[in-house]
């Protein structure tokens, strides 16, 4: 499994660089969100991506036999980097391959406090990536770095 968490401005070159090293059936997890900072703007807005989302762009750039999953887009890096605290966020997992999503949901389950939800096809990344900009805005407004999402009224898939 390869996890891509780079600024949007670096996504294209990163995908081109790793493409020759990827193996058939390998899972690539895209965490990148197309924030406006990629073009000198604000982190509370996204830029429109021709493919629909950063995940769909990444998928187009990958070999057809590599499985793209979008996940962790709405989880603060600050939380994921602090191994002494439970994450206490939900992770929305999108992709077009059920087995690849199940593998990523298993990874989510291994993170203390995190819960994973199968959020459907990679197309749904369009909405999920937009939520990240909103979360950045809320975190700034409330002076925190770790605000995230919790889905209520249903059981997680992980």
Regions found by a protein language model. Give the residues of each.
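Glycine-rich beta-alpha junction loops
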Residues: 10, 32-35, 75-76, 97, ...
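General beta-strand structural signal in soluble alpha/beta enzymes
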Residues: 29, 67-73, 116-119
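Short, structured coil segments at secondary-structure junctions
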Residues: 24, 62-64, 111-112
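Active-site phosphate/pyrophosphate- and oxyanion-stabilizing loops and adjacent acidic/basic residues
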Residues: 16, 56, 60, 106
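Active-site-lining helix/loop region of Rossmann-like oxidoreductase modules
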Residues: 88-158
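Rossmann-fold dehydrogenase core element
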Residues: 48-73
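Rossmann-like NAD(P)-binding element
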Residues: 1-29, 33-41
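Short beta-strand and adjoining strand-loop segment in the mid-core
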Residues: 41-51, 56, 82-99
């Amino acid at each position: 499994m390869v996890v891509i968490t780079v600024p949007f401005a670096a996504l294209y070159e990163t995908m081109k660089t790793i493409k020759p090293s990827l193996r058939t059936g390998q899972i690539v997890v895209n965490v990148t969100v197309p924030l406006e900072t990629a073009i000198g703007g604000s982190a509370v807005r996204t830029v429109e991506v021709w493919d629909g989302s950063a995940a769909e762009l990444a998928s187009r750039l990958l070999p057809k036999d590599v499985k793209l999953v979008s996940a962790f887009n709405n989880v603060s890096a600050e939380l994921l980097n602090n191994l002494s605290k439970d994450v206490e966020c939900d992770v929305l997992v999108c992709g077009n391959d059920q087995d690849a999503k199940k593998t990523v949901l298993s990874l989510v389950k291994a993170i203390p406090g995190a819960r994973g939800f199968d959020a459907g096809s990679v197309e749904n990344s369009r909405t999920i990536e937009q939520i990240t900009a909103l979360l950045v805005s809320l975190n700034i407004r409330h002076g925190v770095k770790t605000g995230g999402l919790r889905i209520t009224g249903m059981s997680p898939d992980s």
